[in-house]
From Swiss-Prot:
It is found in: Nucleus. The gene is Trib3. Residues 320-333 have a biased composition (Basic and acidic residues). It comes from Mus musculus (Mouse). Residues 1-127 are annotated as: Interaction with DDIT3/CHOP. SMART domains: S_TKc (SM00220). This is Tribbles homolog 3.
Amino acid sequence: MRATPLAASADVSCRKKPLEFDDNIDAKCPVLKRVRDEPEPGPLPSLLPPSPPPASDLSPAVAPATRLGPYILLEREQGSCSYRALHCPTGTEYTCKVYPASEAQAVLAPYARLPTHQHVARPTEVLLGSRLLYIFFTKTHGDLHSLVRSRRGIPESEAAGLFRQMASAVAHCHKHGLVLRDLKLRRFVFSNCERTKLVLENLEDACVMTGSDDSLWDKHACPAYVGPEILSSRPSYSGKAADVWSLGVALFTMLAGRYPFHDSEPVLLFGKIRRGTFALPEGLSAPARCLIRCLLRKEPSERLVALGILLHPWLREDHGRVSPPQSDRREMDQVVPDGPQLEEAEEGEVGLYG
């Protein structure tokens, strides 16, 4: 889901580099193909019967069981612009993200800029219709938010391996001039059934930067992961440093099973974030506590850069299975929510960011 745009000056937009596909597109980026995007009748496979969502949920794109070239689009994933898709010739299942065709250049620009990386998902095929853009991704096996929520946190030995993959993906994006902006646990999904390998789900909401200046002016983030500088009155902020703050929130949540800053009232939540004070849970090793503090620095310039995270001792050592006692976890009131809640802000909260 897209991050909630925060209140900002109307005359200032996100800085993105114009894309010229012929010159800048990566050699391994799927070639854009043009297709008809009107529904085509065709038999539905009996092994994957569609479960159509309510008609009101089908906006803005396509009806369920729509034939699209060699694919059939099945039901829409709740609360997103993604659909289950079946590749008929092979029977392989994919995830298809659908956008207005007018957004094709902006949506594909980050993929054209970014070289292939093992922890960043890449489209397997891109189809452009007269009205809509269809981007197909390999099917994944759940997201990190769901894993942390179900287990109320994960032990350091496991978290270190997963977080190393997350930091590697972000460092790769930053190295090649992408600011991700909407970083959260839900954006990282498992590429294998064993749920040991992570990929950044997509580059939606990423900004393509020009030069070394990563300043952004638009206020764009998720409530639980937003950095204090975005909530301040400063006209601009470092996009890369804001991404690092979000990584710090993610790491804290993975280890503690709760957010470092939480309140049911958004205004109070943002006040806690602005103050930048949080309590680390008991049971964490000294290197883990050190890394969290290096990421959740109130002053953006004092935070580690993404590449520096990979050099931190906590990610370079052998880990014992260190985790907070189960009795402490049951008493925590700031657990990761069962539903979207803070990760997917309602429109009514938008004005509270300013």
